[in-house]
Amino acid sequence: MKLIIATRKSQLALWQSEHVAQILKNTHQIEVLLEGFKTKGDVLLDSPLAKIGGKGLFTKELEESMLRKEAHLAVHSLKDVPSFFPQGLVLAAVSKREQSTDAMLSQNYKDFLSLPKGAKIGTTSLRRKMQLLLLRPDLEIISLRGNVNSRIEKLKNNEFDAIILAMAGIKRLNLDKQVNFVYEFSKDELIPAASQGALGIESIKDEKILELLKCLNDENALIETSIEREFIATLEGGCQVPIGINAELLGDEICVRAVLGLPDGSEILKDKRMIKKNDFKGFGEGLAKEFITKGAKELLKKAESII
């Protein structure tokens, strides 16, 4: 049997797809091929992500290729995957999670507190912008698009004092070797995006394919990301609004951190809870409903109106 993986052509996306392909080859001794596609998010590089917005910015073209039967599965950064899937497609697996944290890369400043007043910080994410300004209102946060290499180049050319990336991507592509300083934020400083650090394997609804993909599943990652995705789905928040949610398994307990608000950090809702591992089902939805009673929907609408 031969499996075809639909993938974006970025360096990180290709790494992720190759990683999954290797596991499938080693486990099942089958042929696995990669088919590259450009998504809307890859093409529209001049606008901030929040302005072009929309669900499936980095997934739609890959999903269409599967529905046309040109591919059997697609490997995504799960944080980019909408909560609901097109008919005929399913989230087949969530692989073992890497670090879910964010990190600051800089040529001149070893940590966040050492950044000078008015320092220029590059990031694509309103979630990061909101929390960075909450910690340091004196910083200048600038939209940073483009592939990873172009972002690193802009940092080295002193267009930015620092840039913010996901720690998982930094590790996967060895970016820490390309800059002088990497500062990893704690989850209390910067609450990560839902499913950050996890890979989501989306596939066609086919029993044989789904059986083959079972080997990619990680129970802990499934538990953590199900809480996070439930929270986002209940709030109806896409990845372009300022929401952070992270569930972290610690033995038989789970630490859940959540935040949402306005991009400038002037208004936020934030919470941190410890729950029993056995109580994870429905917790994300329940927490989101608590946020809604505190005005979360109105706050997110306000955020969307000023993006």
Curated annotation (Swiss-Prot):
It is an enzyme of class 2 (transferase). Its EC number is 2.5.1.61. It holds the Pfam family Porphobil_deam. Its cofactor is dipyrromethane. One of its GO terms (cellular component) is cytoplasm. Binds 1 dipyrromethane group covalently. The keyword Transferase applies. This is Porphobilinogen deaminase. The gene is hemC.
